[in-house]
Amino acid sequence: MTNKLKKMLKFPCTFTYKVIGLAQPELTNNIIKIIQNHIPGDYAPQIKSSNKGTYLSISITICAKNFKQIKNLYNELSKIHLVRMVL
């Protein structure tokens, strides 16, 4: 999958992460903080709540300079204790 993704992307490019995690106020802030550390900028994440309000789906788009940047962000976002899945 990684090789296919590398071949499909031409850098720099926009790349959207969808992060699904527990519905806690600090989740969005933690996601933005990690992204700001790698790629400073203004971000406007789209946030959707699950039907029961247990989870949040947060979509955030970045401008990636290379594949390593995409992979590193994916790994760091996955380490947030409230995160259940990163797409």
Curated annotation (Swiss-Prot):
Gene3D superfamilies the UniProt entry points to: 3.30.70.260
Which Cys residues form disulphide pairs? none
Q: Which InterPro entries match?
A: UPF0250_YbeD-like, YbeD-like_sf
Q: What is one GO cellular-component annotation here?
A: cytosol
Question: Pfam families per the record?
Answer: DUF493
Instruction: Check the record and name the HAMAP family matching this protein.
Output: UPF0250
Q: State the family it belongs to.
A: Belongs to the UPF0250 family.
Q: Entry's NCBIfam families? A: PRK04998.1
Which protein, by its recorded name, is this? Answer: UPF0250 protein BCc_307
